[in-house]
């Protein structure tokens, strides 16, 4: 299957990003020419999804590096680290952000050459991360086919948030598995949770499915249990923003509830993510930093306030699904039980 969704494109001296805050009502591509603009694009979720954030941050490092005016290597690296620090501060939960920045920084720090050569090395490393992520997502999709239920012949798969081409370099993780199932004629229907409060399932996942003719049914988040009780769902496949060494997985808020419901109804629950999303330095999910976002996301829809003044709000962007609720974690190297994840390290 060709990759028809390209949320990130490198074009000579800038990065082109699909503005995901406008979908599905408008399709707009924005030019990102500075690292400050890239940091803002990540923070405001013009670009979102852990792998896509990582790719974007790598390009952001280059956008900053090419503006550094010095011939002194030490000064160059100091200024580059300051740029990296700005990018690291944008979103705390998605580990791919830190993984990509650390990879670029380690590559540059270990290299020789003059400043233009180091700048070019940063760009080439960012391009490599970009290309590798697309190949990785396609591999995740194919690995997922091996663990999906054998019956029925055509599956109904429920997914949460958006772990598709828009959240990666293309193709997607959870939606990558779904795309591969569609390609192999194993998919009957996708059920997409709307995913409050930002509605990425409603706005983004359904949009991706429509673009490729994949049958999709949107439901409200609180309808998932009913759908499972009625036997409508054969499997749940979600993405992840950070997975710990023991297999706990942080994903968009509401994923944990979905996993509990799936367990109660004996519906297999899969997490699809690249190995770069696994943070082996953390032993369990209690150590994952959980981003809290603007309460406006909860009390407003568009520009319309939907609750009275005087109410307090709590808006965590992610929750952590314990490993014991996860049937398997699907990576580019294979699908394994959460407690076997350590065997894929390295």
UniProtKB/Swiss-Prot annotation:
The keyword Isomerase applies. InterPro entries: IF-2B-related, IF-M1Pi, IF_2B-like_C, Initiation_fac_2B_a/b/d, M1Pi_N, NagB/RpiA_transferase-like. It is an enzyme of class 5 (isomerase). Its EC number is 5.3.1.23. One of its GO terms (molecular function) is S-methyl-5-thioribose-1-phosphate isomerase activity. Pathway: Amino-acid biosynthesis; L-methionine biosynthesis via salvage pathway; L-methionine from S-methyl-5-thio-alpha-D-ribose 1-phosphate: step 1/6. This is Methylthioribose-1-phosphate isomerase. It comes from Picosynechococcus sp. (strain ATCC 27264 / PCC 7002 / PR-6) (Agmenellum quadruplicatum). The gene is mtnA.
């Amino acid at each position: 299957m060709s990759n028809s969704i390209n949320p990130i494109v490198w074009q000579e001296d800038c990065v082109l990003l699909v503005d995901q805050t406008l979908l599905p009502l408008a399709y707009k591509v924005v030019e990102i020419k500075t690292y400050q603009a890239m940091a803002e694009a990540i923070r405001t979720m013009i670009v979102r999804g852990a792998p896509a954030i990582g790719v974007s941050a790598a390009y952001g490092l280059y956008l900053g590096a090419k503006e550094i005016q010095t011939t002194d290597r030490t000064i160059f690296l100091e200024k580059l680290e300051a740029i990296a620090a700005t990018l690291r501060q944008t979103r705390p939960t998605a580990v791919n952000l830190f993984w990509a920045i650390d990879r670029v920084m380690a590559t540059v720090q270990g290299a020789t050459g003059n400043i233009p050569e180091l700048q070019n090395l940063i760009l080439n490393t960012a391009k490599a991360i970009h290309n590798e992520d697309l190949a990785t997502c396609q591999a995740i999709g194919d690995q997922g086919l091996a663990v999906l239920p054998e019956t029925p012949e055509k599956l109904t798969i429920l997914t949460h948030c958006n772990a598709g081409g828009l959240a990666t370099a293309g193709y997607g993780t959870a939606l990558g598995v779904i795309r591969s199932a569609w390609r192999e004629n194993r998919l009957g229907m996708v059920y997409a949770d709307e995913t409050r409060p930002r509605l990425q399932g409603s706005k983004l996942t359904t949009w991706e499915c429509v673009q490729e003719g994949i049958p999709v049914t949107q439901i409200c988040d609180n309808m998932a249990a009913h759908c499972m009780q009625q036997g409508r769902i054969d499997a749940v496949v979600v993405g992840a923003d950070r997975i710990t060494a023991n297999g706990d997985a942080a994903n968009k808020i509401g994923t944990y509830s979905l996993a509990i419901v799936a367990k109660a109804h004996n519906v297999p629950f899969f997490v699809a993510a690249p190995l770069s999303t696994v943070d082996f330095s953390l032993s369990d999910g209690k150590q994952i930093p959980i981003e809290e976002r603007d309460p406006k996301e909860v009390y407003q829809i568009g520009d319309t306030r939907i609750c009275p003044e005087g109410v307090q709000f709590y808006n965590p962007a992610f929750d952590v699904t314990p490993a014991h609720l996860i049937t398997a974690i699907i990576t580019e190297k294979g699908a394994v039980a959460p407690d076997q994840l350590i065997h894929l390290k390295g």
